[in-house]
Amino acid sequence: MLEALFRDSVEEAINDSIKEGVVLAVYNTARDDQWLKSWFKGDDVSLDTLAEHSIWLRLVKDTEQFQLFEQVFPNVVVPSIYLIRAGKIELIIQGEDDRHWEKLLACIGIKDKKAGESSSRETNPGLAREEKSSRDVHRKNARERIAETTLEIQRREQLKQRKLAEEERERIIRLVRADRAERKALDETHHRTLDDDKPLDVHDYIKDAQKLHSSKCVLQIRMTDGKTLKHEFNSSETLNDVRKWVDVNRTDGDCPYSFHRGIPRVTFKDSDELKTLETLELTPRSALLLKPLETQNSGLSVTGMEGPSLLGRLYKGFSTWWHNDKDPEVTSQREETSKPNRHEVRSSTPLSGAASSSCFQYNNVREPVQSSAHASPMLTPSGTRYPSETNLTTSRSVSPNVFQFVNNDHQEDPEDPTTFNGNNVHLEKKKDEDKK
């Protein structure tokens, strides 16, 4: 019943209130109409009469419209009715009071008009009929306005839905067109690839063929000690000419080597050294490495055969004192053996089982080195009984001069030989003689 009294549009209610000059009744509620129904007497005055003399608006708490109203009129009490005329508050109805209905009618102006109507009816019955017909017209007009407002709201909602549907349809059409264009472009690209029989041009940007035929060749050569040499050669010169220049200017010794290139990784052979630098694709500039050659004699070497070591000299003095009277031949043999020899050592034939190690024979086997490309001969083991004998000098690098002595006396008694293996001294025989 009360729902037909309230307007739906806030703007429309405010505009009609200002235009007609009537009171704007703003009903503030918290979604519960019990307070209004407790004192509202709809039987005394019809809703059409209230709608004719005032415009009613309903605001629910915590809504956007209620918050806007609270900004204009702060400290709004819920539930309450604000009666506003020309932008000013004339009356606020709130709380529990039996006179709310009379105050409302008095502020709206219906009370005075009702009294005048009662007196006119008594004096003039025809006027009463006219007023009744006019009230019917106003009641009809109020219903029509409510119906028109409802239809307007429905029409706006339909237009909004229609607009959204049209926008969605346009979006789908754009997506379909974009998909068709993409498919068409892919098909054209595929057919163009299949129909194109022209071979693709392959460009090699790694090296320029014209620069490979330059007349000069700059080589940067890294020696075995990490230092570098840089020189400019003619492209017609061979790699052997480069070797000769390196042999003259190198500072890392005279070890044999071969040329090695990092990119592309190539180790040049002896046959490649007869080719020109242009043929080997070293022009216009390249970097070479000196790679030391590994020979079969590089595993065994004798270092510093300049003189007897400290242990050798001590043993020489001790053995001279020991065998001075009994064994002069052994002493002379040891003195001959301890003489310095600067030549490479080759192992002799194995001795008998009584000897703890083999003896070495010194031979002059050095040959002159003609070029750095050939490895010089080095010490090679031969005829050794034990594998550890080949590493004799490397295992004792602290004492560079290692000699082995063999006593020839008392060969008829192999159980107790008098030998020196470079590590310890056998003194058992000397002790036995002292006891005697």
Curated annotation (Swiss-Prot):
Q: Where do Low complexity bias regions lie?
A: 347-357
Bias (Polar residues) ranges: 371-408
Q: Where is this region: Disordered?
A: 115-141, 325-357, 371-436
The protein's superkingdom reads Eukaryota
Q: Start and end of every UBX domain?
A: 212-290
What else the UniProt entry mentions is: Present with 2190 molecules/cell in log phase SD medium.
Any signal peptide, and if so, which residues? Answer: none
What role does it play? Involved in CDC48-dependent protein degradation through the ubiquitin/proteasome pathway.
- A GO cellular component annotation in the UniProt record: endoplasmic reticulum
The record's disulfide annotation reads: none
Question: What name appears for this protein in its UniProt entry?
Answer: UBX domain-containing protein 7
Instruction: Name positions with the PTM Phosphoserine.
Output: S388
Q: Where is the protein situated, by its record's location annotation?
A: Endoplasmic reticulum
Pfam families reported for this sequence = UBX, UBX7_N
Query: Cross-link position, Glycyl lysine isopeptide (Lys-Gly) (interchain with G-Cter in ubiquitin)?
Result: K19
Read off the PANTHER family from this record.
UBX DOMAIN-CONTAINING PROTEIN 4
In the record, biological process GO terms are:
ERAD pathway; sporulation resulting in formation of a cellular spore; ubiquitin-dependent protein catabolic process
Q: Which SMART domains match?
A: UBX
The UniProt subunit note reads as follows:
Interacts with CDC48.
Q: Could you list this entry's UniProt keywords, alphabetically sorted.
A: Endoplasmic reticulum, Isopeptide bond, Phosphoprotein, Ubl conjugation, Ubl conjugation pathway
* Principal location: endoplasmic reticulum
